[in-house]
């Protein structure tokens, strides 16, 4: 009996070291060698300073910027999660109605029937950095007007920031809001010169 306990303890310790230390360090090393940008969180830098991750959405409330999806967790990556409200839950409809009204208020001239679901509903993680191209195009008029840019210029920024389907098959075309807003910032700087 004592021999079995010793063997069990040794087995446990060996696997704790292998799976708790060796494996994570080896995988981290491989990730840093093969995918250094992604391994470090896909951090986007401007003038050498981090401004965000292309993997985590940010809250843009200023009308000068394209807004992203609503977040059930206020874009807090430490408490990722969606609302988990069922379609039959009155709170879901209250939240949806509030988001629709807010979007319509910020984007006059947009019809309720034109609003895509992604811009008024939070994602499952509450941290989605992407919106649909349609959601971006619906904001072009407001963003162009507030920034004093021609609508066509802002529309082209959206066009340039559309990411296609993964491997041409999976998912839907999407726009990373942070990248789009950084492109917009560059365009604003160009027009001020």
UniProtKB/Swiss-Prot annotation:
It is found in: Cell membrane. The keyword Ribosomal protein does not apply. Keywords: ATP-binding, Cell membrane, Ion transport, Membrane, Nucleotide-binding, Potassium, Potassium transport, Transmembrane, Transmembrane helix, Transport. It comes from the Bacteria. Belongs to the KdpC family. The system is composed of three essential subunits: KdpA, KdpB and KdpC. Part of the high-affinity ATP-driven potassium transport (or Kdp) system, which catalyzes the hydrolysis of ATP coupled with the electrogenic transport of potassium into the cytoplasm. This subunit acts as a catalytic chaperone that increases the ATP-binding affinity of the ATP-hydrolyzing subunit KdpB by the formation of a transient KdpB/KdpC/ATP ternary complex. This is Potassium-transporting ATPase KdpC subunit. It comes from Caldanaerobacter subterraneus subsp. tengcongensis (strain DSM 15242 / JCM 11007 / NBRC 100824 / MB4).
